[in-house]
A protein has these predicted regions:
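Metal-dependent phosphoesterase core characteristic of DEDDh/y 3'-5' exonuclease domains
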Residues: 1-132
Length: 132
């Protein structure tokens, strides 16, 4: 979730170095940012096999939307249905790298940067599939 990470980095930078200090200064303005969650929702989780997976194992939010977090994504790509995300830096990065690699392997176009509510891409796809 790049949006969350960028907020956390801005807050941490300000707490460490004072108000007005920036995490990414203007010299880095041309860096292309990518949100793994958005990328996964666009190219991996918007596939019939993912929709079948979440339906089969009832991996939905309370409001009936498909779960699209890293834990569910890793369960999907690894087949490890018992997997629970550690929520510890390195362990989380390791599974997110595997999700990212799987996304790149799809060789599909995707948006760069931060997409608002990437889960809604999958929810829309899921709804459209159910209406067919």
């Amino acid at each position: 979730n790049l949006n969350f990470d960028m907020r956390a980095l801005r807050t941490t930078t300000e707490k460490l170095y004072g108000k007005g200090k920036r995490f990414l200064t203007s010299e880095y303005k041309d860096i292309e940012l990518m949100c793994i969650w958005s990328f996964a929702c666009e190219v991996l989780y918007s596939r019939p096999s993912f929709i079948n997976f979440i339906d089969k194992y009832n991996l939905m939010t309370e409001k009936g939307n498909p779960l699209t977090n890293a834990e569910v994504g890793y369960r999907y790509i690894s087949g490890d249905l018992e997997f629970e995300e550690a929520h510890r830096g390195l362990q989380d990065v390791e599974i997110e790298c595997q999700i990212l690699a799987k996304c790149f392997a799809q060789k599909k176009k995707h948006e760069s940067g931060i997409l608002g509510n990437p889960w809604s891409i999958v929810a829309k796809y899921n709804k459209e599939k159910k209406e067919i």
